[in-house]
Every structure is written in structure tokens, then in C-alpha cells.
């Protein structure tokens, strides 16, 4: 099989169906965009095993956008305590307050509006849009950059903007029309 020409996403999806981990933020179908968002922010620079109890506790305290938006920053930081990188919690809190005020508590369904939220970049926007809304959006993080660089024999610096764009285009070529979020999760 020539990996450069073959559309291999069905193989990855089959593998993920058999081997994907059972995680609390994957419990619902369709997925709640708020829960996807919280999990993705918590998982930045943090292992899944570490995040799991924090996520469960967070959802007990702030199960919805209105609940988090109404919380004080002190409450938010208290719930985040132990996860580190506290700017993630402050940014999430501020962004959720914006979603509550500007969008009536509904996470926007277009990339431009999602990316305008504090602390949300290309990866998180792609994850929210693909996982919660089923949109064909790539979620490319450092792990995906490394995987695709190996698969496609890319030797240039994967952190350079041109190479990131090249790899994102390759991911987009592989994204299936059905279940793009599942494909993104399988890559992660």
C-alpha cells in the first residue's frame, strides 16, 4: 500500500472502534460541545489519566455553560487546582462567559466564531466542530504533526508554518465525510 496515495481513514476508524478508550467526555451522542471544549482544554499538556478525575469533578460543579459562566474566578481556579497552567482555566472561564452573553450559552458552530474565543486555537476549534457538530474540520496538534510527518516522510521542521499547513492539508484529505470527529480522536 502506498500511504501517500491510499485513503486509509477507514482502517484507522476500524482500529479505533476496536481499541478506542472509554472516556467520560465521549459518553454522549451527539457530543455536547461544552464537554468537548472542557476536555480539550484540560488535555492540553496533561495526560488523560490525570485529567479524568478533574473532568468528572469539574462537570459535577459546572455541568453547563451557564453554570460555569455564573461561577466566580476563585471557584473556577479552586476546581482547576492541581491541573496546572491556570491560564487555561481563566481563559476557559472568560470564553464561556462570552458564549453565554453573545451566543445565549450555545457554542458557535462556525470556525471563525469558535476561534475568536479566548484560548481557542486551530486544534481546539477543529476538535469542537468535528466532535460535537460533525463538521469536516481537522484537529491537528503536535502528536498529529509527528504522525503525519512519519507517514508521509516529511523531514522539514513540523513546527514551521508552511509544514503545519502542508500536514493540515494532508489530514483534511484523509478526513472522512462521515465521522470526522471520530477520525480526529483516533489520531489522538
Regions found by a protein language model. Give the residues of each.
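Catalytic cores of DNA base-excision repair glycosylases
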Residues: 2-6, 10-11, 17-188
Amino acid at each position: 500500500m502506498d500511504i501517500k496515495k491510499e485513503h486509509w481513514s477507514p482502517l484507522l476508524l476500524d482500529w479505533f472502534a476496536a481499541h478506542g478508550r472509554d472516556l467520560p467526555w465521549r459518553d454522549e451522542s451527539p457530543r455536547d460541545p461544552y464537554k468537548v471544549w472542557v476536555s480539550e482544554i484540560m488535555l492540553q499538556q496533561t495526560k488523560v489519566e490525570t485529567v479524568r478525575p478533574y473532568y468528572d469533578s469539574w462537570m459535577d460543579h459546572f455541568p453547563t455553560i451557564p453554570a460555569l459562566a455564573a461561577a466566580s474566578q476563585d471557584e473556577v481556579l479552586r476546581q482547576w487546582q492541581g491541573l496546572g497552567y491556570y491560564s487555561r482555566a481563566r481563559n476557559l472561564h472568560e470564553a464561556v462567559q462570552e458564549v453565554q452573553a453573545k451566543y445565549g450559552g450555545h457554542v458557535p458552530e462556525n470556525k471563525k466564531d469558535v476561534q475568536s474565543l479566548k484560548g481557542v486555537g486551530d486544534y481546539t476549534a477543529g476538535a469542537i466542530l468535528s466532535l460535537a457538530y460533525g463538521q469536516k474540520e481537522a484537529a491537528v496538534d503536535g502528536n498529529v504533526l509527528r504522525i503525519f510527518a512519519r507517514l508521509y516522510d516529511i523531514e522539514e521542521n513540523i513546527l514551521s508554518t508552511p509544514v503545519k499547513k502542508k500536514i493540515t492539508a494532508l489530514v483534511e484529505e484523509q478526513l472522512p465525510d462521515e465521522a470526522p470527529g471520530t477520525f480526529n480522536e483516533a489520531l489522538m
